[in-house]
Amino acid sequence: MNLPIKNLVPDEQLIKEVQYNCDISDARDHGIYSMCSLVLKLRNLYKWEKGLQPWSEPEAAELLDWIEARESYWEEIAQQEFRPLTLNGRTCPVDDVNAVNGNNGARPYIYGAGHGRSMKAIFFLAEVVDHLSMEDCPVLLLGREHAREMASPLAMVQEGQVLVRTEPLRYFLYDHIQELRSSCRSSYRYFLSSYGLLAGGELDQQKLSAVLDQIAVNERHLFIYHEIGELLEDSLDSETQRRLIGRFPGSVIEFVSRAVRDVLAD
């Protein structure tokens, strides 16, 4: 990655424990995705695991072998419980983010835990590269990720802070720019042209790899302000929505409630 990321590595045992819980989450709930979405998420998980850039495409046979092995692994662990986390010789529950991160946020990494679509468990462990304040809300910019699961939301609110995950954001932007190139919408073409990505009407792939990090820096405020909106929105608070989704996961009720809250936040 070309962004200025410090080498701030968490304890190896903690990394393994968080990643194991990520794997269990994927094993339990990968069925919430369509086949197409699942393959795309697995492809990016493979790239992350192998340290590949978003534009580096694996050999199809190698990727399929990896997916087959991953599905077999999921069958082995799907019924396992999440593993407590070990920190300084003591254990703590997987949802105790304050115990892992420290109440003063002094550690150079952050542990994220929560729930996403259809109450899929979200875990990750990432290095903190910068602290910002926007609209009086604390914002943490995250860099290298040492553990992650398949969903990998680009940004989230945790303990009153907005967390922005640079690695998933880079994969997301790259994939969506590939989709934009076939669109004839003038707004999409304007976006691509503003970064000099159109050459003779076609997407300049080489230029994209060179400017992807800058695009991530320039566009991340869109995700930050959305999360700030969710943090400040109180007509449909996060706890009410969490209970609603927990009662009706994967339903029209969940999707409508998420859409309403997104609109209110924006």
Label each residue range with its predicted role:
Residues 1-136:
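N-terminal low-structure segments adjacent to metalloprotease catalytic domains
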Residues 164-169, 226, 235-236:
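Short loop/turn segments at strand-loop or loop-helix junctions that form parts
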Residues 150-218:
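Active-site scaffold of zinc-dependent metalloenzymes
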Residues 3, 218, 231-261:
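Post-HEXXH active-site segment of zinc metalloproteases
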Residues 126-152, 203-206:
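Short linear interaction motifs
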Residues 216-229:
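Short alpha-helix carrying the canonical HExxH Zn2+-binding catalytic motif
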Residues 159, 167-170, 252-266:
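Metalloprotease/metallohydrolase-associated module, dominated by Zn2+-dependent proteases
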